[in-house]
Amino acid sequence: MEKIMKKDDIQTDYIIYDNLAMTSKKTRFITNSQQLLRWDVEKNTYSKINEKKLIKTMHSLIDETDFIVISDYNKGVCSDLLLKDTIKAANHKEIKVFVDPKGSDFYKYKNAYCITPNTLETRAVYNGPLKDDKDFEKACKFICDTFSIKTCVITRGKDGMTVYESNTFSHIRSNPKDVFDVSGAGDTVIATLATYKTRGESLINSAKIANLAAEHVVGKFGTTPITEQELNKYL
């Protein structure tokens, strides 16, 4: 992975290795170039020593940062302490924090700028129905009010997105032609959303661009990124 990152001129100086942790093994079941399901084998053995290293690294880099994306895979890396320290430091510097959550405890993301749960992740914290636009509006408001998060973008798969900001709701429709592999769609959404929002786009326009990026990513086989040049063709 580090070799691939270096080949693409991605900085690798701050990667932290843990020789005691087990790398997740993900087995994908494919038919006709479409992913049916995935089987994961893993252990959450992340150490407190690495938590301290991450916090120290975060503080050393925050002055060079335009925005922060927290992609929580619920593997032990995104500890409560790391999240609390990161969000607090970012807010002190007026840096926006975007969170792709996991699990049923969204309190650990308190005071983040934006959270982007999918429908399944929303169900983990919201007990109301999720059938139509109004239901998703209520869920967005509940998440922001309950967990003190400024904005919310719920990704709804083929039904698009619901965006909540300053007591205003917007719905973005999705139109994927063919869905071959949803792997990486959430990462594509939050990376695109954060990039365009930080460049000065409104949250709703940033979400529209992120939705468009995700549409094209799921139409490719495998975990495939979309380049800015590709995305510009569709804007």
Model-identified regions with their sequence ranges:
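Extended, hydrophobic alpha-helical segments in both membrane/secreted and soluble proteins
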Residues: 69, 86, 97-99, 105-108, ...
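ATP-dependent carboxylate/acyl-activation modules
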Residues: 169-170, 227
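Conserved post-catalytic alpha-helical subdomain immediately downstream of the catalytic base
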Residues: 146-151, 175-234
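Solvent-exposed alpha-helix faces
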Residues: 59, 141, 211-215
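Conserved N-terminal subdomain of the carbohydrate kinase-like
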Residues: 1-69, 225-235
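Residue-level signal for inorganic ion chemistry
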Residues: 68-71, 118
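Conserved phosphate/ATP/ADP-binding segment of small-molecule kinases
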Residues: 75-169
